[in-house]
Every structure is written in C-alpha cells, then in structure tokens.
Amino acid sequence: SGTGEITHSVLAEWGLDVSAPVPSHEPTLTDRLLDYAHKLGIRVPCHLPSGSMPAEFWERFPDAKKLVMQWSEYAPYTQLHPSDPLYKRFMVDFVRHYRERYGSDHLYIAEFASESRILEGAENVQEARIQFVKAISEALSEADPDGTWVPSSWSFDLSADDPGNPWQANWTVEQVREYLDAATYPLIVWDTWSEEAAKYERTDYFYGHPWAFSVLHCFGGETYLLGNVKELIRRAHALGENPQEVGCVGFNVVPENSDYNSFYFELAARLQWNPRAVDLDEYVQKYCRLRYGPQYVAATEPVWRLLVETVYGEDSGTVKIIMDPLYWFRPDLRLLAGWPEDDERVIPMWRRRSEFIPKLRRAAELLLAAGNLVGENNMARRDLVDIARQWIAERFNQALIGARDAFLAGNGGELARLEPICLTLLDDQARLLASWPAYRLSRQVAQVRDEYPDPVKAVKLLHVWCNPVEGQESVPLRDYYRMDLDELVADYYKPRVAAYFALLRDKCAAGRTTVTDEEFDAVYAPVERAFVAAPLCPLPDDEDPTDVVQDLLEDNVE
C-alpha cells in the first residue's frame, strides 16, 4: 500500500524535482485498511516497487544501469537494474520511509520481472535474477533486520521457454533453486496457484526453503461458478498431519477476484486453520447453516450437493482449464480458450458438462422451494441468480458447440436452428443480470465516475482490452475482464455472437467450412469498436430476480 506515495517521498528527499506527497490531516483509505487489519491481528506485507523510475530520475542519474522491460504487448518500460548501487540505496530508503509512514509488519513482497520480458540490459536473464536476490537481501538486511521476504512462485514459470511468449522468459527447476539459495535474508516462498500448478512438488518443496500453500483459484474475469473442491481438500490433506515436515509454514488465498464463489473461498479459509479436520460433507452442512440459518439446512443441502457434483466438481474450470461461458470470448471454430496442451482433456469435459444442465435447473428449483428463504435472505437470492446464470451459460455453451459442429459438417439447417436459441439465451441472461444490482454495468461506471473523464468508455475499455486508457490494446489480454454484466452481454457479447452466426451462415451457403483468423477479426473488430464508442444504454432494472428466474424456468421446460 502507498507504493507511489513512498517512491515520491524518497525521490524528493534525493533532491529530484518531483512533487512530494502532501500529508493528509485525515486518515487515508490505506491508513484505515491497515488499522482495520491490525485490529484483526493481520500482518500486512509491504509491497516493494519494481524499480521503475520517472523521467526526472534518469535525467539526474544518466549513467544508472537500466533494464528495458515489456509486459504483454504494451509499451516497453524502464526500471533500475538491481546491480546498480542506486537500486539498493533506493530500496533501503523506501523501507525507511514506509516504516515511518505506516509502521511495519516486517513482511516484504518483491518480485523480479514477473510476467515481463527483458528487452535490453541483461543478456543473461538468470544472472540478473541472482543480482536482484542479492540486492534485495542486502537492502532488507540493512533496512529491517527483523523482516521476512515473501517471494511469489508466480514468477517461476516452469513450462518450456517460448521466445514468442509475450510474458517472460521461463525457468528451470535448477534456476529456481539457485535463485532461492542466493538469498541471505529470511524468506517464505508464496507458492501462488498451489491448487493446480503445485510447484512445491516440482521443486522438492522449494529445496528446503519455507513456503506457503497459496490458492489462486481465479483471474480477474473468471467470475462464473468454478473450483474443484475435492481436489483442493485432497491437496491440503496430502501435506500430511504435520505440513512443517515438508517446509509448509502457511496457507493463504490470493484470488484476483473474491466477489464470487464464496463456497470455494470459505472452504479454503477452513483449510487454512486445520486442513486435516475438514470433511466435505460436514463443510456443506455447516455452510448451509451459517449462510441460511439452521431451519433451512435440510432444504438447502441438496442444492449444494448438486453444485458439488457439477460446477464445483471434477469437471470444474480452472485458470488453465477454461470452462467459461463461451460468449465471453471471440467464438471461432475451436471454441477452446485455454492452454493448447490441455485440448485433449478439455474437449470431452465440454461434452460431459451437458449433464450439468438438468442438475443446475434442479438446484434453482430447490432453492425456490425452500419456504420463504429466497424472499428473506439476500445471500440466497444471490445464490439463485448465480445458479440461474450458470444454467443459462451451460445451455448456451452446448448450443454454440452444436452450431460449430453443424457448420463443420455443412449442415446449414441445424446451424439455422441453433442461432435463435443462442441469441435468445443471451437475451435471457441480460434480463437476469439487470435484475441484480451487482451485475449491472452501470454500477461499475458509477463506482469510477470521479476517476476518468469518460467513465463509460473507461469501463468498457477495461472489459474489452484490460486497460481503461484508450490506445492501450494487447491482443493476449483481450476480454481478460470478461464477466456477466447486463450491458456487456446485451451490447457486446450478443452482437459478437450474432456476427459469428452471420459469417458461418454465409460460408455455409457458399459450401465452405473453413474460416480464417483474418475473416473472424474483420467481423469482430467493428463490434468491439462500436461497443466502446456507444453511450451507456441501461436495461430495464425493475424486475425482481426471483420472478425472472421463475419465468425462465417456466419458459424453458426440459
């Protein structure tokens, strides 16, 4: 917290012509958050800056060593090289200023080139990594001898290196060991994505260095119902009765989005305290009791058993096995948005997920039938909306896959039959989302109204291009913040799906069953531009979500 503020304080002290922050007479949001966390007994890490410096720094220190970096396809940026003496000096002063301003919980997060490629300044990337570890160790030893460095394993991409990868140069397990062994300051490796990547297994529990099991679960746009709960419990139990024997000294949860899937996150929180004591059946029962009240346990347990069988089961999506609603992406002829190496596993999963549809419908019906629960409990209403939107999404996915298959088979009649089904499902989804305030695009716009000159465009750019600033576009990050919001579905996803069907229809009529990437881009790019340029067009929001779900169930008898 307060990274930019502290950086400017340090540079102003160094005599650079930067505006030092003006002390606030009232507690800032950062102050209030830290105070609240400390009242709960939570230690808050200090996130050290990467070393990126303003133009004034390079004018003052023209001979300072630098690294030119690039993240995805965005403009390259420059940061101070960790081997330059100014790097250590800056980090020491940063920690001093931070502790004077906010105090210290003696935990420090610092990463080197995470997700970024080095374009200039380091021919040997591993050598630069080791220089970073040594500089951080020396700086923290001087600035806070009682602290602990918390490096994240997210940087340790252990897949085969691909020079065309826009993110970073990958690692070998030997390089990870050399990196950690170079540290002369206490550390705890934060093994981000333990529940799936499990790098602690591939590195022999980080070669004796203390580490923490860290659940990632989702990126910023993965906001559908997902998370294999049995696998999470299995991995936590596999650490044994005494996880410290394999160096595991912590268990944390670090999602990019925590506003969804509370069932999964509550389970992860319970595993943090005593993994071996957690039993899934007992957890489901307790979750229902705490969420809805003891009088509704018998009525709601079957709802969550169905969800554990489906969206929270073995065919659940992950950050790597992407089972998202397919309308969140540009549809093509593959309809596979995850890692290509997983295609053979994912294709049969899509087929099996057709079995989710009647079970999700039944879950919604059971929740509606639970006395007056949905009427009196806002969390139950939220759960009803989430189950219903997942039911709609699964039906859409199967219909779109069927339409793709019909096109590849040259079956124009089946393609024509499925088109209105897909588009109607998106109308149903937009209507449902508009009935729940948290799922309205206008709500996001209202939250940032004072932050951007054109908040509508900023929010739309964020959802399309992962960046609220116009002109900052990166193809690998397109639709990163994909999610179910009413106008996003009605004014962006639906027109894109309509363009998909129009293109396939024309191709099919001409007797062709192939479409190039360039042809898809030609019909999708105008949809994206039109959505970003259009004003906000709020949908009717006067319906009760319970009524909407009941209508949709009645109108779609299976």
Predicted segments with their positions:
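Long, charge-rich alpha-helical interaction segments
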Residues: 316, 320-336
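Catalytic-core regions of glycoside hydrolase
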Residues: 1-297, 301-308, 313, 336, ...
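Histidine-centered catalytic/metal-binding microenvironments
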Residues: 340-558
